[in-house]
Amino acid sequence: MNSFNIDVITLLPKAFELIKNLGVITRALDKNLINVNLHDLREYGEGSYRQVDDKPYGGGAGMVLKPGPIFKAHESINKFPKSKTLLMTPQGKVLKQKDFVRWSTLDQIIIICGQYEGFDERVRCLADEEISIGDYVLSGGEIPALSIINGLTRLLPGTLGDPDSLVNESHNSPLLEHPQYTRPQIFRDMKVPDVLINGNHKEIELWREERMLKRTIKRRKDLIKNEFCDLPIDEYDGDDWLWDL
């Protein structure tokens, strides 16, 4: 089995040292399931000072990443047949679980991390997709890139100790995951639901399916409006036609 290749263009390669101690990613690295290659943007900087940024045309606050160093870094990367370049930007489409599933069928992803006030607009032509992890702004693209590496790696065969743990996770379906409990059975007067300890697997499965639907409607109606358009989802307040969570 060939390794999945992840190339990251960044001004802060040290930010990715964390992956050496993240269980799932560390396991994948040890098994050669993934290769993570960091490309320090500073090494492709221009002039004796290896400049990577400059003032924006038209004025404005902050500095903008120059196109030259990013293009050089991207061109230096060996491209695999099935490869996509992802540009980390708060202007991109919001990352979804289905994106990880799509990318897991590739040979390679190349991630470009922004910094400062962003990057020269011409950098966008390098990207197959522009990705955001939410409607907020961070100081750089490194944290979003780490999120992508983590979410993608755990889908690769051989990474997780128990592959079945992926099946019922939140966002693998339109529904959020059901509540989970472990020992002790009673903790500070909070008791595990009886149905989970009665040994009736059909009742347990029904209970879980009901909780998945109810939890999703109560917390993330936006995930299921298209799936359950015949139900009065917008009218649900947690106390009427569905049980409380």
UniProtKB/Swiss-Prot annotation:
It holds the Pfam family tRNA_m1G_MT. Keywords: Cytoplasm, Methyltransferase, S-adenosyl-L-methionine, Transferase, tRNA processing. It is an enzyme of class 2 (transferase). It is found in: Cytoplasm. Its EC number is 2.1.1.228. SUPFAM superfamilies: alpha/beta knot. The keyword Transferase applies. GO terms for biological process: tRNA N1-guanine methylation. InterPro entries: Alpha/beta_knot_MTases, tRNA_m1G_MeTrfase_C_sf, tRNA_m1G_MeTrfase_TrmD, tRNA_m1G_MTases_N, tRNA_MeTrfase_TRMD/TRM10. It catalyses: guanosine(37) in tRNA + S-adenosyl-L-methionine = N(1)-methylguanosine(37) in tRNA + S-adenosyl-L-homocysteine + H(+). S-adenosyl-L-methionine binds at G114, I133, G134, D135, Y136, V137, L138. GO terms for molecular function: tRNA (guanine(37)-N1)-methyltransferase activity. Transmembrane segments: none annotated. Gene3D superfamilies: 3.40.1280.10, tRNA(m1g37)methyltransferase, domain 2. PANTHER family: TRNA (GUANINE-N(1)-)-METHYLTRANSFERASE. Specifically methylates guanosine-37 in various tRNAs. Belongs to the RNA methyltransferase TrmD family. Homodimer. This is tRNA (guanine-N(1)-)-methyltransferase. The lineage of its organism: Bacteria, Bacillati, Cyanobacteriota, Cyanophyceae, Synechococcales.
